[in-house]
Amino acid sequence: MFRTCTKIGTVPKVLVNQKGLIDGLRRVTTDATTSRANPAHVPEEHDKPFPVKLDDSVFEGYKIDVPSTEIEVTKGELLGLYEKMVTIRRLELACDALYKAKKIRGFCHLSIGQEAVAAGIEGAITLDDSIITSYRCHGFAYTRGLSIRSIIGELMGRQCGASKGKGGSMHIFAKNFYGGNGIVGAQIPLGAGIGFAQKYLEKPTTTFALYGDGASNQGQAFEAFNMAKLWGLPVIFACENNKYGMGTSAERSSAMTEFYKRGQYIPGLLVNGMDVLAVLQASKFAKKYTVENSQPLLMEFVTYRYGGHSMSDPGTTYRSREEVQKVRAARDPIEGLKKHIMEWGVANANELKNIEKRIRGMVDEEVRIAEESPFPDPIEESLFSDVYVAGTEPAYARGRNSLEYHQYK
């Protein structure tokens, strides 16, 4: 009965043309340098907006009109986005070095190459909006307002860490940032729950529930989509499609790889996740749509991770080194924005070099402070403290060890 089936293991080739378009699957570009602006229209003032034209192929919609490709930005916004992305990359490179020096143990998932997604989303929302994501969370933790030392300290298990050194890489939290989640796809229904709370409290805010292409096949994703549509929740389900779920390409694991269409009855938006300006514009559009209509939206950011799935994965057994080098050389999100900044006269190479030098020094100093922070006290009580944010603890708790049969305060 299976004679007519395609042989297991054969998948269509994914071809990338010179413009960065993925042939045969989708029309969105992954080029980070397609935006256009006239340098003559760029004002001297850092807070005065000027027009930028995004490429027509940075968006693709499903049951929804795509955002306008005519946007306005300021010098200050562009430099702020550049600083955010450079800081995230320096943070992740520091994590890489500390892990290899065995100062970070356990799980550690880096987002080098995906910086435009975190920076662009944060630039489009406020700190009153919420974000929940997967274990690849360091960049989002930083954009949500955590210090570098609190992130690095958490990874090294130090008291200065965001979770007092007891959560590790996958369990980092801040106000309106709900992690870092260690279970694949677990954050998707939790994101729907945050959206429910926002609607119940009548807040004009939205939630970004981010997950990867690998997690998109989890059953709980579809359950969350259904409830969000049924109840009209202001949630943006955002898939960071970095092409590989652990070591399996999307084409080998998913019968349908257009993840922005997975909601069926929920509109979707495909976005060039390597272009921070496209991410910024799409995220502004998504927030406006979900808040004003009290409805969910699916998004897919087409991006790429340079490293392996985690620090224990070299990332070269299921893809070639040439593939990674080609993307890094041609479509790097930081280099793409850097090119625009210089071409449009926002800043020159020397000014950008000074920014990079300042960020490198800041990250190095934060790492030094984190390394000097002590470990949690090696006593039994430490295992059961810092479960809740100070001031939010329940009046009573029980069952923290086998001898506690009664409630206690």
Swiss-Prot record:
InterPro entries linked to this entry: DH_E1 (IPR001017), PDH_E1_Alpha_Subunit (IPR050642), Pyrv_DH_E1_asu_subgrp-y (IPR017597), THDP-binding (IPR029061)
Binding site for Mg(2+): 213, 242, 244
Enzyme class of the recorded protein, top EC level: oxidoreductase
Enzyme Commission identifier(s): 1.2.4.1
The protein's required cofactors: thiamine diphosphate; Mg(2+)
CDD domains: TPP_E1_PDC_ADC_BCADC (cd02000)
Main location: mitochondrion
Ligand binding (pyruvate): 109, 135-136, 174, 182, 184, 213-215, 242, 244
Modified residues (Phosphoserine): 310, 312
GO molecular function terms listed in the Swiss-Prot or TrEMBL record: metal ion binding; pyruvate dehydrogenase (acetyl-transferring) activity
Activity regulation statement: E1 activity is regulated by phosphorylation (inactivation) and dephosphorylation (activation) of the alpha subunit.
Catalysed reaction, written as an equation: N(6)-[(R)-lipoyl]-L-lysyl-[protein] + pyruvate + H(+) = N(6)-[(R)-S(8)-acetyldihydrolipoyl]-L-lysyl-[protein] + CO2
GO BP term, example: aerobic respiration
SUPFAM superfamilies attached to this UniProt entry: Thiamin diphosphate-binding fold (THDP-binding)
NCBIfam families xrefs: PDH_E1_alph_y
Entry protein name: Pyruvate dehydrogenase E1 component subunit alpha, mitochondrial
UniProt organism field: Schizosaccharomyces pombe (strain 972 / ATCC 24843)
Gene: pda1
